[in-house]
Curated annotation (Swiss-Prot):
Name of the protein: FMN-dependent NADH:quinone oxidoreductase 2
Biological role stated in the UniProt entry: Quinone reductase that provides resistance to thiol-specific stress caused by electrophilic quinones.
Named cofactor requirement(s): FMN
Details of cofactor binding: Binds 1 FMN per subunit.
Cross-referenced Gene3D superfamilies: 3.40.50.360
Native organism: Lactococcus lactis subsp. lactis (strain IL1403) (Streptococcus lactis)
Disulfide bridge positions per record: none
InterPro entries xrefs: Flavodoxin_fold, Flavoprotein-like_sf, FMN-dep_NADH:Q_OxRdtase_AzoR1, NADH:quinone_OxRdtase_FMN_depd
């Protein structure tokens, strides 16, 4: 039995989101193909993920014997909790829109909890080495324009998850803002792709 972590990176519901429509279709198809697997869901917009602000970063570099505030201790514990949640999953699926050429800020904060030295990668004399080998990561993204996987959001997500050694792949639905009349056609193609991916993911 494997564990799938489902990461919702959109502030709205599937009624207003093509990426979440794809995510819902993926999860439904995945459950049918892998009925014994455990599925855990994470909504980054309601999870109160700590951001890398002054309070958190200063706590990270304070040292073992430093006196931390209760708030700093809480942020460190919650940050580590999201790291461990990612590590405990065998597979991860992430769905998000592209906002201003990038992923939403809340999703970026979650990604920061995933990219952790000593946990998901390590430094060696030959350079950094990923520690998340064998972990499958599927990225579902909706782009209003057509970017052909060359948008900064895709490049960033690919760079991070390849850096930590995971088996990263992406399925995008794009062009619906450029040509709204084709939205249903584009969505149908997207759904077909994610349902097919779910069979063997």
């Amino acid at each position: 039995m494997s564990k799938l972590l489902v990461v919702k990176g959109h502030p709205l519901t599937a009624d207003y989101s093509l990426s979440l429509k794809g995510l819902d279709a993926f999860v439904k198809a995945y459950k049918a193909a892998h009925p014994e697997d455990e599925i855990e869901e994470l909504d980054v917009f309601s999870a109160d993920i700590p951001t890398l602000n002054t309070e958190l970063v200063s706590a990270m570099f304070a040292g073992e014997n430093a006196e931390l505030t209760a708030s700093q201790k809480d942020k460190l514990a919650r940050f580590a909790g999201f790291t461990e949640q990612f590590l405990s999953a065998d597979k991860v699926v992430i769905a998000n829109p592209m906002y201003n050429l990038m992923i939403p800020a809340e999703l970026k904060s979650w990604v920061d909890t995933v990219n952790v030295a000593g946990k998901t990668f390590k430094y060696t004399a030959e350079g950094p080495v990923g520690l998340a080998n064998g972990k499958k990561v599927l990225h579902l993204q909706a782009n209003g324009g057509v970017y052909g996987a060359q948008d900064p959001a895709t490049i960033y997500m690919s760079a991070i998850f390849n850096f930590i050694g995971s088996d990263f792949r992406q399925i995008a639905v794009e062009g619906h803002a450029y040509d709204p009349e084709k939205t249903e056609e584009l969505l149908s193609e997207f759904i077909n792709k994610v349902e097919l991916e779910a069979q063997t993911f």
